[in-house]
């Protein structure tokens, strides 16, 4: 952090947005429509971020997309689902800010910027009480970024890739004045800006911060974007900003190993199970894929096997990542459980016992000892399929505390003039624990808070 009351940049703009993922691009669209001259600085050679690595699913209630599909949902119910999952540990005002604004943001992106959304209504994601996962037609995060990038280009918003922001500039009275960017060749650029929006996500790629705040995942596979180096947290500490829930994160218990491909949790929600190398189940797969990362990593060899059938394989093929896993030969099939166990190199007897147990539970529509409900319509039938998986860290959920206009708050309760945060740079809605993550919380805060931050620029700064 540099202090320079006389700072003058090579470039002068109204709003510098650090990060070119869903949060940053949404903020850029909103800020530009507010009349701001915007620069998006992206450290990589193309726009991507954690969004491009995700499935691109955005939860929202009472949207136009839901109405078109005759899905009756409410923001009140969505709010309750989030709070129940995080055990009421997140700030309800912050959660409400996200729930209210994600509806506005998605309807706006669709109506004003031509981004086509539909709602996935084949299955419910863990702990959601309604169909509310919105996606673009391709159902990938990369496609979502592409739509946002095209919208940004249509507004002639300036995007500068290969520009890594390495320092912020503030005045002696604490106002943000600009930043210093660095190019791959080592050259630097000074940027004067009335406002800065931090859209640089969290710190999943910073091993020191992970060891400090999430030690249980310091040796896990990191499945997020390598550029998530925690600048928001580092700069926030230097600015004496309020920071919370740094122990919170999204994990995932279903990453094909060693292929490194995400395998959709829809397979578990619609009847699949996970077993360890001993052929035994070890948890309630319906609690959530985030906390399942820890459960899988606690198993022998830190691996598990997803077991499913032809019906679920067809469901999986609706997702590009699953199709990639098939092409990579990560998916194993067999006509019998005995053959499947042999192919997986796990004990035949215990796996057969497990399958008999879950079949009996399904036949009786019963609840198992882990608390999972089984039902007869989702009984697994031959041929059987399996994929070897491990647990992974996806992205962190703690960050800078902001107000309802996305302004960063200091420990003394005042605002850092000119500084805003959204997405993973801001504290999320999942609370301080891995189990608090509700499916889609990442893109929920990225797009809703990006929208809030961009819209706030005109009202406060310009």
Question: Which residues make up each language-model segment?
Answer:
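Glycine-rich loop(s) and the adjacent beta-strand/alpha-helix scaffold that form part
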Residues: 184-255, 443-452, 456
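N-terminal Rossmann-like FAD-binding beta1-loop-alpha1 element of flavoenzymes
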Residues: 15-40
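An anion/pyrophosphate-binding glycine-rich loop and adjacent beta-alpha core
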Residues: 233-346, 350
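Conserved N-terminal/central alpha/beta ligand/cofactor-binding core
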Residues: 2-6, 37, 43-158, 162-164, ...
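A glycine-rich dinucleotide-binding beta-alpha-beta segment and adjacent secondary-structure elements
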Residues: 167, 350-433
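A conserved short coil-to-beta-strand element within the FAD-binding core of flavoproteins
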Residues: 161-175
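C-terminal structured subdomain/cap of oxidoreductase catalytic cores
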Residues: 9-10, 29, 322, 398-462
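Extreme N-terminal leader/targeting segments of oxidoreductases
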Residues: 1-15, 33, 462
